[in-house]
Amino acid sequence: MNTTTLTLNESWLSRRNLFDWVFAALVVAGGLFAFARYAGSMDYYEKPILIAAVIATIAIGWFWRPLRVLAIVVAAASLLAIASYQGDLARADTVFWLKYFLSSQSAILWMSVLFFMSTLFYWLGFFGGKQADTFDAIGSRLAWAAVTMALIGTMVRWYESHQLGPDIGHIPVSNLYEVFVLFCWLTAVFYLYFEERYGTRALGAFVMLVVSAAVGFLLWYTIVREAHEIQPLVPALQSWWMKLHVPANFIGYGTFALAAMVAFAYLIKEQAEEKRWYKLTPIWLLGVALCFVPVAFRQRVQEAGGSYWVIYAGISALIAAGILLGRKRIAARLPANEVLDDVMYKSITVGFAFFTIATVLGALWAADAWGGYWSWDPKETWALIVWLNYAAWLHMRLMSGLRGRPAAWWALVGLLVTTFALDRKSVV
């Protein structure tokens, strides 16, 4: 007689394999190396952030294994870039790897190109016939490559800022250029997690549209304002609360944007057989509006860039119209409505949790910088409006079973509310 021994209530740690522990050892070694080499350049708050980052990286890498490879590649490439500089930023113009790949600006330009290419291949997946799965796979790999270059650019930019002077170095989450890079890779990473979790790549075409829109703004902002230049922080931005507040905030913004694009896909699937164009017009208008989410930040700068935005508007309108024209073929490849609804719900749940944390951290930052937790100025008032909007969405979902088309429309309008709020308040 065969007997089988069952292990009940196996602990989380006991389920770790050899690669898990090797990864943890590498992360700890990297953290110790960073502390030993750069502790003198760290502010008092950056040391506990480093410790927390080591713990979080190990935990997240164990939870979602693709992030382990990402972390190792980013760390190796960042260290190669730092070693190539040899303490001289002028080497970015003479060393091949720095000039074309690993300086912060080069890496972020590669991020931009790769996100555009990823978006293209994801959309080719809807119309590629027998090659559709191949196109989707290429789109996914390009998205991973773009995230990798974004993180390399961020890490190297952090190093570059410290090389400019002891009072200039800072974690690169402090201006519009840096937070748009943050938004792009955070949104993409959350999408890639859902892609693996639900076993479908069809949503990549929609999510990468809003990421590409953000990249389009980033490139315009770089050209018009030379925003890639590293500048010293004003005193109010030197608070360590801000270094926690901004990433938490943009996890919220990124997942809210992801939920809105999934909601857009849901409505396209629902309207696949609709022939009356007047009923499709609201979806077309919202599709164009979604592409303009990053443009909420444009009026912060003085340069109009009129011709660029005319072209941008035209491309956005054509993309939205093309999606509606191909809605039957697109709907056929989209996952079931239940999957779309679940991704929407989980994205908003994650976003709401981090936006709540960011709001609390923002209040602590305000108290530290300006002496009061809450003053009802525009940025605080609109942050509260955004929070209440998504709190109401989740309440209706949990208490009244909000699902389907009403939930999708609300998620879409919710992102527009968030965009309007961002237009009325500072980035951070």
Protein language model features and the residues they cover:
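Transmembrane alpha-helices
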Residues: 9-95, 109, 113-117, 274-327
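Membrane-interface helix-loop-helix modules in multi-pass inner-membrane proteins
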Residues: 12-13, 39-47, 86-87, 147-207, ...
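Hydrophobic cores of alpha-helical transmembrane segments in multi-pass inner/ER membrane proteins
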Residues: 48-58, 108-121, 179-192, 247-265, ...
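Short aromatic-rich membrane-water interface segments that cap or initiate transmembrane helices
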Residues: 97-113, 167-181, 234-252, 307, ...
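Interfacial and helix-entry/exit segments of alpha-helical transmembrane bundles
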Residues: 139-145, 206-211, 278-284, 332-356, ...
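Membrane-interface helix-loop-helix junctions at boundaries between adjacent transmembrane segments
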Residues: 168-177, 186-252, 269, 275-276
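Conserved small/polar residues in nucleotide/adenosyl-binding loops
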Residues: 427
